[in-house]
């Protein structure tokens, strides 16, 4: 009887086992196994979360009502040296995807090769730059050769995990926001073909099957590179006019499903500016609207985590390196706990959970602990961390085969009887010494390129210590060499003549950024014990080490506000960058990387601390600035006298969202661009501009790489709405004036050199109604 029952069940069992699952594109909807499916995705990044906490973070996303995880695959963390791949431990992306499936989640994979993500060089490996003439994100033969190898390795890890193979992966992205980089359908097509070749396989019927391929971009540029056979998705932020964002897509593809592939829950922080936040109500309202209309989304970020070690990137134009924390003001905070944003969103998500009960919010894997103040008592000078020395011309990090760290550049000088001006393109933070005496710094963040040196005698030694920060991750400037880039010159006037000196004989010394180098330096150097009152030793660049003891482990936030600038290692783990200017003053230290008993802390401080003390807090400090001077651009001496000038154009902007172009009656020539606003469409006095471009006489946009803000009559810096936001390549950020500051409002841009301009392009805020949009204006070029 039992045997007969088993035989009866066998055909059904075999049929079920053979039935292939699928994710396809239907009319106005995605189809999961043939049924309409709305993607509710949580963006999370496996390298930004300790592996021991992966399961907890995935469960947190599920408890928020998400059904999918969206993740980038970071090329440069998997291939840190050319040809050497690592998919183990915290880099085991396949294990992360399997864990997602175990928790009942689907997965969207975004394998680049470029990913942005406020990550070093946008995920591209630094060693690509050893080929100085490489064309990144183009059909450069070497670039594409390495891309194909990388994508093949990724597919070896993940292609067996597609939904057609019984795994969780339903979609794979082709490149990433390419419309913000350029227009090159041939390149994007080749990336698509590479992914198809690795992810698509023939089924039993001989049909090629694989995950749905899609490309994401902004509503303002997605048509530049849109391929006919790919799904098109939009990226935009909270508060955006959602109907407007999908309007053009609906016109071009009226039957296509709609998806916001990056709905920005917050924003990233940069060194020297305040911590970014975004209102919960705008995020919740946007998701509610999308779900009510059947629009799929991925919430970027749902949990941001931490850019440990040297992995934080930088934005451009205007070099703006990102802090270590990637909290992002996301619903799940940096250390994995639910925020008020989380619970507000959870209430809304419950409405769209098919009547099912929401999963419980999981308990944190570890509690939060504090650590009493302790002192780092060992010290060796920074040069004990040297790796290689080469004599000759100036060399970049890449030419010295070093990805991350610092370099010391040294030479001897001829006699210069008067003060001189040192000029160099330093990437990124340079400190200048003569005969061991500190002279000053050149900081790329402040767009500094020169420094005045005192008179020197023949044979004086010039040392320049250059720390490289994260490589630019967005825009054309991602080809970001580190060190002294190009020539260094000294100019001086004496004996009624101007002299230019270009030292040619340099000693290039590399100081890599890694734990092994730090340990070697402390072992081989003549370690000095820093007594409590010997703070004369704590003002020097070097390696510092100390210890703290624990009876119980837990997550904590180590405070480094007394320190200068550099990197921190705890028990061998690279925790990230510190910089006294803030806003981040603490580093998140996961309890899974701590231990009972003695714990080691090493700080590589390239500046030197004010005091060698550290303590552990139970809350982070992400919004404490310690600046030498304000970030505002309101020096009255920089304000131009517009009364004596004739405007290049004047008139009235249209109301509403979207780009507008103002053509000049005749070309205007000048180095400075001023836009004066005398009224707004919404009747308020709070003006805002999201982005500005200028066009040359050929009608094409001119580069903004050299732009800086000269003057702004008013800037709302509490929300980081400073003048530099109008050329930061981000349509969701904006310059905004302070309420009550009064008309006229004025913003002046230094273009970097004299330009001939025929038109100005203006973008108001992306939110519905375009709050703060300018009505009456005058444009000056001088």
Language-model regions: role of each:
Residues 575, 638-644, 653-709, 713-782:
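Aromatic, loop-rich ligand-recognition surfaces of beta-strand-rich domains
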Residues 198, 239-333, 337:
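Catalytic-core region of carbohydrate-active enzymes that cleave or remodel glycosidic bonds
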Residues 83-91, 102, 113-138, 188-193, ...:
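Aromatic- and acidic-residue-enriched segments that line the glycan-binding/catalytic groove
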Residues 54-120, 192-196:
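Aromatic-lined substrate-binding rim segments of carbohydrate-active enzymes
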Residues 419-433, 462, 548-571, 578-579, ...:
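Aromatic-lined ligand-binding clefts that engage carbohydrates, nucleic acids, or primary amines
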Residues 464-470, 603-609, 676-683:
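Short beta-strand-plus-loop segments that form exposed binding edges in beta-rich domains
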Residues 143-227:
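Active-site neighborhood of glycoside hydrolase catalytic domains
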Residues 16-68, 98, 553:
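N-terminal carbohydrate-binding accessory modules
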């Amino acid at each position: 009887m039992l045997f007969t029952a088993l035989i009866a069940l066998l055909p059904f069992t075999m049929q079920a086992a053979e039935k292939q699952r699928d994710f396809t594109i239907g009319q106005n909807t995605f189809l999961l196994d043939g049924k309409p499916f709305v993607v509710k995705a949580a963006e999370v990044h496996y390298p930004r979360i300790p592996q021991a906490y992966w399961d907890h973070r995935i469960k947190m996303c599920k408890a928020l009502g998400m059904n999918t995880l969206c993740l980038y695959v970071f090329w440069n963390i998997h291939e840190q040296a050319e040809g050497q791949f690592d998919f183990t431990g915290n880099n085991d992306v396949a294990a992360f995807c399997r864990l997602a499936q175990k928790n009942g989640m689907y997965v969207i994979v975004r394998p680049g090769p470029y990913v942005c993500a406020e990550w070093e060089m946008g995920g591209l490996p630094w060693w690509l730059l050893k080929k100085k003439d490489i064309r990144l994100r183009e059909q450069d033969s070497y670039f594409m050769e390495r891309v194909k190898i990388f994508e093949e390795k990724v597919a070896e890890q993940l292609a067996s995990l597609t939904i057609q193979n019984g795994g969780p992966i339903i979609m794979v992205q082709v490149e990433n926001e390419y419309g913000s980089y350029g227009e090159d359908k041939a390149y994007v097509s080749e990336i698509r073909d590479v992914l198809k070749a690795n992810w698509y396989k023939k089924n039993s019927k001989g049909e090629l099957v694989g995950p749905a391929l899609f490309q994401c971009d902004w509503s303002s540029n997605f048509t530049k590179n849109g391929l006919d056979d790919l799904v098109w998705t939009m990226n935009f932020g909270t508060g955006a006019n959602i109907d407007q964002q999908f309007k053009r897509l609906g016109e071009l593809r009226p039957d296509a499903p709609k998806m916001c592939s990056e709905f920005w829950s917050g924003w990233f922080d940069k060194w020297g500016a305040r911590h970014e936040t975004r209102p919960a109500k705008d995020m919740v309202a946007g998701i509610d609207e999308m779900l009510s209309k059947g629009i799929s989304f991925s919430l970027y970020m749902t949990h941001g985590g931490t850019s440990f070690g040297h992995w934080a990137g930088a934005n451009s134009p205007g070099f703006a390196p990102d802090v270590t924390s990637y909290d992002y003001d996301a619903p799940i905070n940096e250390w994995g706990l639910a925020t008020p944003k989380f619970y507000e969103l959870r209430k809304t998500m419950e409405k769209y959970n098919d009547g099912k009960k929401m999963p419980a919010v999981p308990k944190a894997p570890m509690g939060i602990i504090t650590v009493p103040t302790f002192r780092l008592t060992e010290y060796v000078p920074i040069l004990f961390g040297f790796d290689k020395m080469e004599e000759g011309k100036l060399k970049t990090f890449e030419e010295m085969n070093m990805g991350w760290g610092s370099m010391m550049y040294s030479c001897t000088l001829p006699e210069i009887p008067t003060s001189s001006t040192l000029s160099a393109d330093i990437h990124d933070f340079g400190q200048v010494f003569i005969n061991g005496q500190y002279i000053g710094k050149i900081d790329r963040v402040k767009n500094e390129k020169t420094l005045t040196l005192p008179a020197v005698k023949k044979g004086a030694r010039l040392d320049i210590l250059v720390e490289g920060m994260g490589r630019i991750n967005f825009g054309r400037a991602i080809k970001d060499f580190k060190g002294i880039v190009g020539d260094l010159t000294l100019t001086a006037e004496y004996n009624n003549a101007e002299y230019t000196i270009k030292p040619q004989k340099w000693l290039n010394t590399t100081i890599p950024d890694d734990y092994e180098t730090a340990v070697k330096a402390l072992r081989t150097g003549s370690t000095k014990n820093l007594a409590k009152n010997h703070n004369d030793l704590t003002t020097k660049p070097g390696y510092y080490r100390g210890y703290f003891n624990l009876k119980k482990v837990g997550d904590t936030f180590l405070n480094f506000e007394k320190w200068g600038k550099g990197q921190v290692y705890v028990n061998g783990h690279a925790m990230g960058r510190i910089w006294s200017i803030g806003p981040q003053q603490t580093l998140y230290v996961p309890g899974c990387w701590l231990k009972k008993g003695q714990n080691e802390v090493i700080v590589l401080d390239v500046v030197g601390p004010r005091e060698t003390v550290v303590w552990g807090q139970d809350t982070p400090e992400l919004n404490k600035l310690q600046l030498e001077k304000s970030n505002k651009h309101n020096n009255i001496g920089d304000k131009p006298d517009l009364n004596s000038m004739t405007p290049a154009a004047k008139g009235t902007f249209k109301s509403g969202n979207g780009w507008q172009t103002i053509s000049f009656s005749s070309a205007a020539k000048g180095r400075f661009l001023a836009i004066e606003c005398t009224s707004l469409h919404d009747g308020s006095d709070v003006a805002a501009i999201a982005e500005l471009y200028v066009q040359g006489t050929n009608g094409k946009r001119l580069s903004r790489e050299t732009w800086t803000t000269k003057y702004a009559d008013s800037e709302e810096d509490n929300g980081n709405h400073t003048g530099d936001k109008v050329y930061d390549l981000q349509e969701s950020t904006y310059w905004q004036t302070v309420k009550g500051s009064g008309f006229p409002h004025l913003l002046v841009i230094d273009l970097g050199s004299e330009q001939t301009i025929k038109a100005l392009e203006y973008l108001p805020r992306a939110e519905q109604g375009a709050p703060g949009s300018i009505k009456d204006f005058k444009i000056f070029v001088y």
